[in-house]
Amino acid sequence: MKARLSTKMVGESLEIHCETEFNRIRATAFPKAYFEKDNDTRTGSKGDYIFRDSDEADTEIVSIMFEMKNENDETATKKKNEDFLKELDKDRIEKQCEYAVLVSLLEPDSELYNSGIVDVSHRYKKMYIIRPQFFIPMITLLRNAAQNSLKYKTELAIVKA
């Protein structure tokens, strides 16, 4: 399939895959979530998707900027995941997202990236690199951690009062 696709189409096929996976479980797993393409280019750049979820009081509990990267096997100049982190961090900050996640099929032979969720927060705050199969688990982990954190903050506020 990849051989017939242009570079732009290969990248878009990864975006469509992730969007389809999310929409399959949206109604049951993320009923209040916002998950849309980032089409706002006023600041000069944009990520691919923004995920935001809120609690029952419509207080935002988590926000994630997603960038999806893929390339043809025949592409002459192979890009590395590292090449996209600075721009992703800039997009995360500009769009006021708490987390940034690079969903990538680049560097297909990398043991590091093939092993699971890679935390690159030592370079860029709250940033991760994942393969597409970890897309839904990553959203779930970050959202659940945020919900638990909110619960503890609420309990602490009650205790202090």
Language-model-derived ranges and their functions:
Residues L5-G11, E15-A161:
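Amphipathic, heptad-repeat alpha-helical coiled-coil/stalk segments that mediate oligomerization
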